Amino acid sequence: MSMLRLYTRVLELLGKEARLGWILAGANLLLAGAQFAEPVLFGRIVDVLSGSPAAGPFGMTSTSPWPLLAVWVVFGLFTILCGVIVALQADRLSHRQRQAVLTGYFEHIMQLPLTYHAGTHSGRLMKVMLQGTDALWRLWLGFFREHFAAMMSLVVLLPLSLTINWRLAILLFALCIVFTMLTTLVVRRTFDMQNEVEAHFSDLSARASDALGNVALVQSFVRVDAEVQGLRFVVDKLLAAQMPVLSWWAVVTVMTRASTTITILAIFAVGIVLNQRGMTSVGEIVMFVSFATMLIQRLEQVVSFINSVFMEAPRLKEFFNVLDAVPAVRDRPDAIDAGRLQGLVEFHDVSFSYDGKRPAVEDLSFVALPGQTIALVGPTGAGKSTAVALLHRAFDPQSGIIKIDGMDIRGLTLASLRRNIGVVFQEALLFDRSIAENLRVGKPDASEEEMRLAASRAQALGFIERADRKFDTHAGERGRMLSGGERQRLSIARALLKDPPILILDEATSALDAVTEAKVNAALDEVMKGRTTFVIAHRLSTIRNATRILVFENGRVIENGTFDELLARGGHFARLAKAQFMTQDGSRIGQPS
């Protein structure tokens, strides 16, 4: 992405603030004109004081400095007032839009597929969000407060200076050319270097976030020194990449200062010669020295702006790369909200592949009637989780169709579909909030009585009541203030509180002890009545009462039947059952464990 295209996208993100942006641009143009008038008036006053008549206001010749001074005061007051208004509005625009873009970015990444999040470190996404929106804020603020006015000053000053004295104006053009050449040279030399610097920043953020997320592991294995040393290594590489960039921009600063001094001396030298030949006045020499001083300030602001865009470019590229990531599924324009569904689920020749090469699910077909419990078993990677992910549209199949109550799920809004499906994940997912807030994820308006009932059914009420703050107890980051079994029971209670017609249990009882598991299974047996339930299971003892069992292998269903039917066939499921029962408790096949 070119620098011009990059900055165009920065301005496009102004969105609803674009109208105010245009108003600020017009105000900056007026400011540029007013600021140009001040050196002109200064020069004319010098001419008057030195005994030469000068052009006064409204085209009149003035022999008194007072009218010129009065006009200067008017322009000065206008510049101050307009500058204050522009600065205030630029500040407000930048802050408002930063928060709007940050919110939009957050909403966007929350809609990206789980495969994207699995391959992208959460610390990197946070770093891209914060650094990207901060970069946008700095560029918007600088552009509308200073940099655009500086550019407009160049547009106004250079052409008008030619109309006053083209010989002295040539020196100003020469100064601009030198600035442009130096800036272009350094940008080209350091562009790749700055990209490398930002890559090291990303590594630094990811490594620090990774270590902090596994602090228990670091302390347990006495890895503090090793992790600190690893971080220092990344910091050293970052500094090694950063120093050459800083050196090049330091050279630009020195060279521009030198060219500035040379230009002012040249204006005096050429001005003296022209004055001696009667081709310019003392006032015009002073005027062009003021022009040069103003031009230098504006050029430095423009270079600062270019430097800002250049320095922020890698961060903004990362930011736009995330924004350009496409969600796996979207609502169709004609998608409907079907309300509460009955739970009749149909898969018809459904196939899906993550990489377009190896199918994760292939030609999957089955029907689950309302109230039935369908168990999905098989080795890791066989396609069980992919099948249920397709059901709640984490992805859409490449071929085939999935229906609920006879409707293609792609014709339902995502919100409508997912309101009708409750999921209990194998790893309990909790927010760093209170137990009540975590439970209300399932039903935002749930009363305390409803939460107590759901917690009781999930065998979670006991430990909640024992806590000092009951339902206001803080769960901690990822629920770390609770045990694994407690986290999982809250996850089950949350799904029960949601009360969906379709329930997905992904090894929902795997984190529970035997006694609690038995109680939760009894509660789940009761709550699954009247719901279509999909159970992903590795422990076959947990699915003995399933209506039907689908045995997966390499994305296909190789066996299909009840628990006893599959045992009687003596196939793949029977071998799994024999291996598990013999290793778990030594009971014979077919005997409840």
Swiss-Prot record:
The entry's keywords: ATP-binding, Cell inner membrane, Cell membrane, Membrane, Nucleotide-binding, Sugar transport, Translocase, Transmembrane, Transmembrane helix, Transport
Listed EC numbers: 7.5.2.3
Domain ABC transporter: from-to ranges: 345-579
Sections of the chain in a coiled coil: none
Residue ranges occupied by any ABC transmembrane type-1 domain in the UniProt entry: 21-311
Enzyme class: translocase
One example GO MF annotation: ABC-type beta-glucan transporter activity
Compartment annotation: Cell inner membrane
Role description: Involved in beta-(1-->2)glucan export. Transmembrane domains (TMD) form a pore in the inner membrane and the ATP-binding domain (NBD) is responsible for energy generation.
Family: Belongs to the ABC transporter superfamily. Beta-(1-->2)glucan exporter (TC 3.A.1.108.1) family.
Record's protein name: Beta-(1-->2)glucan export ATP-binding/permease protein NdvA
Naturally occurring in which organism (per UniProt): Nitrobacter hamburgensis (strain DSM 10229 / NCIMB 13809 / X14)
